Amino acid sequence: MMNKGIVMDIKKHSVVVLTPNGEFITCKRKGDSCMIGEEISFDEQEQKASRFSIPYFLKPASLLVACFLCALLFFYNQPEEKVFAYVSVDINPSLEVSVTKDLRVIDLQACNDDGRRILKELKQWENKQLQEVIRTIIKQSQEDKYLTNDKQVMLTAIAKDKLLEPKLEKVMKELKKEYELKHITVEYQSSTMQVRENAIKAGIGTGVYIKQENEKNKSVTPPATPSNPVENEEERQSQPDSSPDVVPDLSSVKDKKYEKPEYKEQKKIEEQPTKQIKENNGRGSQQENRGNQQENNGRESQQGNNGNQQGNNGRESQQGNNGNQQGNNGRGSQGNNGHQQENNGRGSQGNNGNQQGNNGRGSQGNNGHQQENNGRGSQGNNGNQQGDNGRGSQQGNNGNQQGDNGRGSQKENVGNEQGNNGRGSQQENRGHQQGNEKKNQ
């Protein structure tokens, strides 16, 4: 069947003809007589397929290309893998590893310039297991002389999913044990997303950021001052020790409560010493007297007397007397010697004959020709002889007598009589009589 059409294109062996139906048909060329735009007649059997045909040898290659495109489209349309945790590796180069739920590395970022140098040298890290990538980072840091013997590897894990923390911790501990055998220190710690964000803003790794913050906190918080046992001991020693000397004398209070009225009136009497009377009050006193009588009462006092009579009263006192009469009485002791008597001590009383000495706390001396009253809070009565009183004592004497009482005092008297009363005193007297009585004798 013959068809007609207008020649639209002329090729070497064929021509393209436009049919009245608007179709383009390629048919064999007949000689060189046809021209473009000329209407020609052609047979349908001579018509060539106008569809595009692929050569036979290209068909396998085209099939491979088609498969590649399909695979590319498939992976392209897949959703991006989710990051479940970050692990910061800080040596001097700092890098951050992003891992999936099964701890595959899907991203690796450098946190500083040294980290970028290491990252450029790392190859084939993507989709590798976390342990393998960390080993690669440590090895490359050793090769580049970043990791030396005086440095350590700090691993900081930040898990988005709390369920992943035990798995991360297990991997980190295995790495720590592995590198301990290689004499490389590996430290592991966990952190939070907020700390990671602060580290990113500071441009450093998370582990380095935590270390710097800890150092700042230590510098701000002042160390607690440890208690110095030496200073505490000095403070305890500086406090007044409770001793029998400091404890208020309750016995004196009791004595005052039950004292007779005449004794109370006698204690109120305060007499000023005459020209020949001298009183010295203080601890550790030393007195020397050359006269008729001497009394030595005071703590740790020493007295020498060359007269007729001497009385030495006090604690642990020693007396020597070579005179007419001497009485020495300690605490609670009583001495009675004929016409003359001296009684010195706490709460002691001595009364005999014409002469009497009464020395002690709250003690009183009796009126007579001679009287001595020595002790705390004691009073001496008017007489021919003198009574010597210790701490806080009052003494009245209108005779040729002298009282020397007190700590650390030194007095000298040249007269008829001298009284010195105290603790631990030593006296020597060369006269007519000597009496020495110690405590509780």
Swiss-Prot record:
Name-wise, this protein is Anti-sigma-I factor RsgI
Subcellular location as annotated: Cell membrane
Q: Where are the transmembrane segments?
A: 54-76
Species in which this protein is naturally found: Bacillus anthracis
Q: Please give the GO cellular component terms listed in this UniProt entry.
A: plasma membrane
Membrane side Extracellular: which residues?
Answer: 77-441
Deletion phenotype, per the entry, is:
Loss of rsgI results in a strong increase in sigI promoter activity in both the exponential and stationary phases.
Q: Where is this region: Disordered?
A: 213-441
InterPro entries, per database record: Anti-sigma_RsgI_N, RsgI_M
Q: What would be one Pfam family of this protein?
A: RsgI_M
Gene that encodes the chain: rsgI
UniProt membrane topology term: Single-pass membrane protein
Q: Which PROSITE patterns match?
A: RSGI_N
Induction remark: Part of the sigI-rsgI operon, which is induced by heat shock.
